[in-house]
Amino acid sequence: MTTTPETQKTAVAHGNYVRGSASKVRRVLDQIRGRSYRDALIMLEFMPYRSTDPITKVLRSAVANAEHNLGMDPSTLVISSAWANSGPVMKRYRPRAQGRAFSIKKQTCHISISVESAPTQTNAEVQN
């Protein structure tokens, strides 16, 4: 008889068209990936980057989805995956001397964060 492993529930939240470049957002996401929800919130609160505000908003939304839709406990949640893809670029022009114009690219990105409950250890695993 084969037993199937318990299916892992995952909650996902997306933040689309967030102002800021994807590379700067990825720099923050790389540091919180794999951490617990509480640890990630503390880290995001004290990081000196502008992209932490929209990331915190998406993280709180993912946890709210897990709590409301799947009935998971927020204290056991871990960030299973977090990624940022580049979005559309808004092009603006800056007037310069002698009738020239320099282009300015205002980057946007799409942030996605998924959370799942951390695996709990049974008594047999703890004793070994």
Curated annotation (Swiss-Prot):
GO molecular function: rRNA binding; structural constituent of ribosome
General function of this protein: This protein binds specifically to 23S rRNA; its binding is stimulated by other ribosomal proteins, e.g. L4, L17, and L20. It is important during the early stages of 50S assembly. It makes multiple contacts with different domains of the 23S rRNA in the assembled 50S subunit and ribosome. The globular domain of the protein is located near the polypeptide exit tunnel on the outside of the subunit, while an extended beta-hairpin is found that lines the wall of the exit tunnel in the center of the 70S ribosome.
Protein family membership: Belongs to the universal ribosomal protein uL22 family.
UniProtKB keywords: Ribonucleoprotein, Ribosomal protein, RNA-binding, rRNA-binding
Domain of life: Bacteria
GO terms, biological process: translation
Record InterPro entries: Ribosomal_uL22 (IPR001063), Ribosomal_uL22_bac/chlpt-type (IPR005727), Ribosomal_uL22_bac/org-type (IPR047867), Ribosomal_uL22_CS (IPR018260), Ribosomal_uL22_sf (IPR036394)
Cysteines engaged in disulfide bonds, as pairs: none
Subunit text: Part of the 50S ribosomal subunit.
Protein name: Large ribosomal subunit protein uL22
NCBIfam families associated with the record: rplV_bact
Coiled coil ranges: none
Annotated GO CC locations: cytosolic large ribosomal subunit
TM ranges: none
